[in-house]
């Protein structure tokens, strides 16, 4: 692959990731109040949300490893992403507090910490990822006394800068530890892709991941424990992201990557993918006025699901048209201007900001 060649399937994966994020946020916004109905919707949120965010972060790692960055570039890009996170928080007061760290602040922190999680300790990419996994497991054990409960409220409540710092590192919705795992996974894919063996590696990892995930499913059945939940008592939990979740999500991302790189299954989302940052940030804005509709009109589970689907499809169309007709007025374009090095930025090589 030449340095200036775009990979359509990377843009397609990015477009798919942002659509899944839109769907998950819409489902969380318009969740039915009935506990029995909410169980069905929670499976949707858990399943799709459990794959959307890891895919987003994996793509970030893939893009960041493409070329070296100066510290000035890192700070500029990270600052931009933190500012976008603040805008998202203001647009979704029903989900976040103004200074709650989220996935965009995680991405900003990953930009700054790439010399750690992206370090090439050995010539073998999988070994490098293994070294990071050992470091993450050690940090998780060391910092476990500081971990907060598996509860959404505790992870978005940010009454002070100190709490915000802990949320960024460990106790938030998308903390650096252990989410750096997915960035390192993306970097690993990128390294193997240069040698055209990425698909074989991903197939092997997928098989291992499927076996481990099936084993956790069998355990949950025998122990009569819920297999997967966003929060609470389950074998796989998203908040916090435990090891069984990391394995399952990594497996899902690997399978999606194989599908995208060997077929044209996600190519239709490629234009959307090139405005993914813009769509991610702006799709929260309507929630400022619409987030109480389900309570005001007592929506049923079916109505909530239909609204979620329509909202997601609308943003798929908006994102595609945005790229085709007004791409100059996007956060991606603004980021390139802010970085002040257009030749080194996202468009030539599917970089992470798109």
Residue spans of the language-model regions?
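Alpha-helical transmembrane segments and their immediate juxtamembrane cytosolic regions
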Residues: 1-354
């Amino acid at each position: 692959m030449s340095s200036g060649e775009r990979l359509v399937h990377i843009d397609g994966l990015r477009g798919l990731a942002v659509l899944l994020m839109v769907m998950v946020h819409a489902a969380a916004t318009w969740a039915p109040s009935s506990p029995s109905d909410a169980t069905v919707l929670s499976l949707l949120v858990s399943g799709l949300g459990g794959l959307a965010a890891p895919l987003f972060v994996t793509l970030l790692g893939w893009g960041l490893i493409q070329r070296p960055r100066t510290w000035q570039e890192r700070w500029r890009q990270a600052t931009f992403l933190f500012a976008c996170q603040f805008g998202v928080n203001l647009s979704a007061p029903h989900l976040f507090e103004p200074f709650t760290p989220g996935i965009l602040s995680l991405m900003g922190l990953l930009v700054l910490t790439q010399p750690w999680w992206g370090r090439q300790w050995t010539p073998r990419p999988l070994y490098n990822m293994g070294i990071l996994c050992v470091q993450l497991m050690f940090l998780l054990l060391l910092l476990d006394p500081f971990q907060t409960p598996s509860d959404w409220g505790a992870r978005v409540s940010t009454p002070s800068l100190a709490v915000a710092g802990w949320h960024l590192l460990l106790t938030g919705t998308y903390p650096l530890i252990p989410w750096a795992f997915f960035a390192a996974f993306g970097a690993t894919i990128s390294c193997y892709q240069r040698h055209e063996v990425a698909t074989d590696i991903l197939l092997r990892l997928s098989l291992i991941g499927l076996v481990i995930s099936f084993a956790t499913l069998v355990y949950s059945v025998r122990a009569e424990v819920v297999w997967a939940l966003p929060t609470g008592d389950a074998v796989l939990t998203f908040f916090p992201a435990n090891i069984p979740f990391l394995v399952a999500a990594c497996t899902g991302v690997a399978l999606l990557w194989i599908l995208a790189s060997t077929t044209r299954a996600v190519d239709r989302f490629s234009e959307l993918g090139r405005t993914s940052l813009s769509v991610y940030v702006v799709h929260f804005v309507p929630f400022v006025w619409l987030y109480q509709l389900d309570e005001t009109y007592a929506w049923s589970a079916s109505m909530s699901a239909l609204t979620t689907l329509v909202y997601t499809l609308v943003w798929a169309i908006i994102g595609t048209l945005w790229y085709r007709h007004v791409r100059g007025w996007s956060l991606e374009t603004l980021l390139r201007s802010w970085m002040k090095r257009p030749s080194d930025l996202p468009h030539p090589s599917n970089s992470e900001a798109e």
